């Protein structure tokens, strides 16, 4: 039987491994990023997906156009989340398959990546509050680690590489996955995964 302490240790190791995996391509492209303008390469608007009811983000992609790094601000209104939630998310997206062209569409059939979200507020914390025993909460309530897989399609508009497109993502996070492992008989698979739909505006 899988225990909560085992899940907690697996979670910590999981985070370290993922950060190492995603840090290597980012570091390799640091010199490229420094030479480019600070103006973002694209803007994204996302619906759902675990980072807010609606989220607005912007970010950069490398020259090979197979890695994107974005920063999002997401909002969940009180009537949906019980309290107003403001969520800051850093998302790293890897596009391992080259662009497939069909008529005027540029299709990326596979995207995958990592999202790290922080939710500020008195009811959320990174470490156990002083009035609770050590490791009372197995996961920090203010921090969420998510994984996703999806795809995107772009359509060029005008000149200078500008385009507009849409993307989808199917994802989950560490809490939902661990709860499913511990309580697979009572938790439906539909409660573990979430779907995101978004629009992407290429600026340069």
Locations of the language-model features?
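Feature captures outer-membrane beta-barrel proteins of Gram-negative bacteria and organelles
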Residues: 34-36, 54-68, 86-97, 195-201
